[in-house]
Amino acid sequence: MKFTPEKPSLFGETLESLTERVVEAGFPSFRGKQVMEWLYKKRVDEWDAMSNLPKAFRTWLDGQYILYLTNSLLDKRSDDVTQKFLLELEDKSLIETVLIRAPQTGVGQESSRKTVCVSIQVGCAYGCKFCDSGLAGFKRNLMVAEVVSQLMHICKMEDAHTKRAKEEIASFDNIVFMGMGEPLANYDTLVQTIKILNAEWGLNFGARRITVSTSGLAPRIMQLAQEGVAVRLAISLHGATNEVRSQIMPVNKKYPLEELIPAAKAFKDKHGRMLTLEFIMIEDINDSLDQAKELTKIAR
């Protein structure tokens, strides 16, 4: 199912696409860049806060766009380390975004390295046995603006606790696409989101600090390797042989290890980034010595 909002969000635009619309509406092209600065550097959430824009232009923006596409329904904290957000989208769909704090010189928001785990689909179609995301099935792909809005929601919240907002940089250190959904199954949204995050006019967030976790869509891994977005790749493995992995991850029946591992290594060779192999130990299924031995062969 595809959802189309009454008005698009500005977070789905690139500088190029926004500038094109601005010029078509009869405004100077430089207004596009000014808007992006207010969005990503100043993190404003209302049109009137864009104080260097003429009222007529702000009125036009208000008629064309909305800002945020997410509304926080629940904020659950755990020992000052993990903070989970239940976010409601415009069509009342629910997704989760998680902020993980890793204390460095002490426990506390200012001294923590922060990682944001974002969702890219509502539900999931892949049915991995250890994951709750697919229990209710797949509902729809998220739009670019819905993914970016998750990150900007965290930015605005954390701005109150850090000095980074004054420096006009993101108020977190890493982004992982490990929330609800399979990132490579919403491929175009994934790539466009990464480009917005990476852009100088966007969050100016380094690709090496972005990790894409996949259940193993081998052809998409090969395609991503050619995109010019040198993100990190994590393979949700959880089984070191086809027999075991297929029990845990149905996707393995379509893309077995003989296809997945070469694709992952080709991605690594293309970008020079170390691969992450994710492996949850499940008693009496994948925790044998034989599995450990096979895993070491894959990891070499």
What label would you give each PLM region?
Residues M1-K114:
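Flexible, acidic/Gly-rich N-terminal and inter-domain linker regions that tether
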Residues E20, T59, S149, Q192-K195, ...:
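Solvent-exposed alpha-helical segments within well-ordered globular domains of core cellular machineries
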Residues K84, T115-S119, T211, E278:
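Short aromatic/hydrophobic contact patches that present stacked aromatics
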Residues T105-E110, T162-E168:
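Intrinsically disordered, low-complexity terminal tails and inter-domain linkers enriched
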Residues D159-T162, S171-R300:
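Conserved AdoMet/S-adenosylmethionine-binding subsite of the radical SAM
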